[in-house]
Amino acid sequence: MAATKPAFNPPGKKGDIIFSVLVKLAALIVLLMLGGIIVSLIISSWPSIQKFGLAFLWTKEWDAPNDIYGALVPIYGTLVTSFIALLIAVPVSFGIALFLTELAPGWLKRPLGIAIELLAAIPSIVYGMWGLFIFAPLFAVYFQEPVGNIMSNIPIVGALFSGPAFGIGILAAGVILAIMIIPYIAAVMRDVFEQTPVMMKESAYGIGCTTWEVIWRIVLPFTKNGVIGGIMLGLGRALGETMAVTFIIGNTYQLDSASLYMPGNSITSALANEFAEAESGLHVAALMELGLILFVITFIVLAASKFMIMRLAKNEGAR
């Protein structure tokens, strides 16, 4: 019997080779872009690195007319506002995610979830304008003044809430950042909580566990990696936020007090305010070094989150 021809020709290896080359090229482009950013930041900031050295990191003074620059105030403002934002946003986001996945009635889950996603879509400049013209005056009258009167006489803690109630400042910027990152963290937490197998939760309820026990002993252990990822996503958003912080932080290079009520500055705000007006080469180099510092901070945060997730996975496997 004569051999019949196949209905179609089998695919050759040429397509696989082309696909493999394209995928590798895409990965290489990502690495080249990352390396290019790092190299360009180092080259552009080199005059500042040569002149100020490591002292740039802990010098408070920023005097553009005299070409004296220090990054301590922007670094302090960036880290403190981000910490305040996380301190507020994480528990609120945790509560929102748990309510949506465990407690909310069916008719409320979808509209509330859409509302959270819409909050994440609001441009940061809108948050900044709202924070400056609406939030800051109310914050000064209804929070800063009464809390300052109560807390200012308490040793150590009182120093954080002392001084005049401007409305704007480091604390106000941290609160605005918290409002901005809550939708991101809450959305990620909600999605990872929904990945918990229903059978595990129903089995826990079946043996008499309360809702809190199910959340604490079933949902959280199963989703802890995703929860950490959501928190780090929010932290990265807070570290890199520019416009909203620029509106509300005060934009001053002063660090004479530990009070959170005082105006300050952040790395992103300094770059946004001064880059277009920088004239001298050293001024531009100092601003580029601020960008390099922000890049390093972001890299450290990412590396720490990856290390934490790896440790959690290792400990889970050892049980």
UniProtKB/Swiss-Prot annotation:
GO terms for biological process: phosphate ion transmembrane transport; response to radiation. InterPro entries: MetI-like, MetI-like_sf, Phosphate_PstC, Phosphate_Transport_Permease. One of its GO terms (cellular component) is membrane. The chain crosses the membrane at residues 25-44, 75-94, 118-137, 168-187, 233-252, 284-303. The keyword rRNA processing does not apply. It comes from the Bacteria. Its main location: membrane. Keywords: Cell inner membrane, Cell membrane, Membrane, Phosphate transport, Transmembrane, Transmembrane helix, Transport. GO terms for molecular function: phosphate transmembrane transporter activity. Signal peptide: none annotated. Residues 45-74, 138-167, 253-283 are periplasmic. This is Phosphate transport system permease protein PstC.
